[in-house]
């Protein structure tokens, strides 16, 4: 039986740039690195960066990875990333504050204030087309 998400592996073209981005801008802790990769950690998230020199970037779809952030930290975090020239890929149109940004390889990321419970509460007030709740 599955117990949850174990780790996330992202292909990256420039390993040092990606380590710096995740460690220095996003606050991940570097646990280990080797010629072709690195292990980082943020809370209980284990992130593996895997060097793929010919990596062409992620697919152009809505797939993205969202990180939780406290409401009190959100504005400062978004301002810091903007000040470092981090590119945004989407404007927030949903419940809770969200900052949608790209890593150096174009992986779509999000910093989101809230959780599944707050999203479901908002959806109960204004459901998406065809939305049905399990309870």
Curated annotation (Swiss-Prot):
Keyword Zinc recorded: yes
SUPFAM superfamilies recorded: Glyoxalase/Bleomycin resistance protein/Dihydroxybiphenyl dioxygenase
Catalytic reaction annotation: RX + glutathione = an S-substituted glutathione + a halide anion + H(+)
Cofactor (UniProt): Mn(2+)
Enzyme kind, highest EC tier: transferase
Highest taxon in the source lineage: Bacteria
GO BP, sorted A to Z: response to antibiotic
GO molecular function: glutathione transferase activity; metal ion binding
Annotated compartments: Cytoplasm
Short name of any one Pfam family annotated for the protein: Glyoxalase
InterPro entries for the chain: Glyas_Bleomycin-R_OHBP_Dase (IPR029068), Glyas_Fos-R_dOase_dom (IPR004360), GlyoxalaseI/FosfomycinResist (IPR050383), VOC (IPR037523)
Alphabetized UniProt keyword annotations: Antibiotic resistance, Cytoplasm, Manganese, Metal-binding, Potassium, Transferase, Zinc
GO cellular component terms given for this protein: cytoplasm
Active site feature: 110 (proton donor/acceptor)
PANTHER family named among the record's database cross-references: GLYOXALASE DOMAIN-CONTAINING PROTEIN 5 (PTHR21366:SF14), GLYOXALASE FAMILY PROTEIN (PTHR21366)
Functional description taken from the UniProt entry: Metalloglutathione transferase which confers resistance to fosfomycin by catalyzing the addition of glutathione to fosfomycin.
Protein name: Glutathione transferase FosA
Originating organism: Pseudomonas aeruginosa (strain ATCC 15692 / DSM 22644 / CIP 104116 / JCM 14847 / LMG 12228 / 1C / PRS 101 / PAO1)
Upper taxonomic lineage: Bacteria, Pseudomonadati, Pseudomonadota, Gammaproteobacteria, Pseudomonadales
């Amino acid at each position: 039986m599955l117990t949850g998400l174990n780790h996330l592996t992202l292909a990256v073209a420039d390993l040092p740039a990606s380590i710096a981005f995740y460690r220095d801008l996003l606050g991940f802790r570097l646990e280990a690195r080797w010629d072709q990769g690195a292990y980082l950690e943020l809370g209980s998230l284990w992130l593996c960066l895997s060097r793929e020199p010919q990596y062409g970037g992620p697919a152009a779809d809505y797939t993205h990875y969202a990180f939780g952030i406290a409401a009190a930290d959100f504005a400062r975090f978004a301002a810091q990333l903007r000040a470092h020239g981090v590119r945004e890929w989407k404007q927030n149109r949903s419940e809770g504050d969200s900052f949608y940004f790209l890593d150096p390889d174009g992986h779509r990321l999000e910093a989101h204030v809230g959780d599944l419970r707050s999203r479901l509460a908002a959806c109960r007030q204004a459901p998406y087309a065809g939305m049905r709740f399990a309870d």
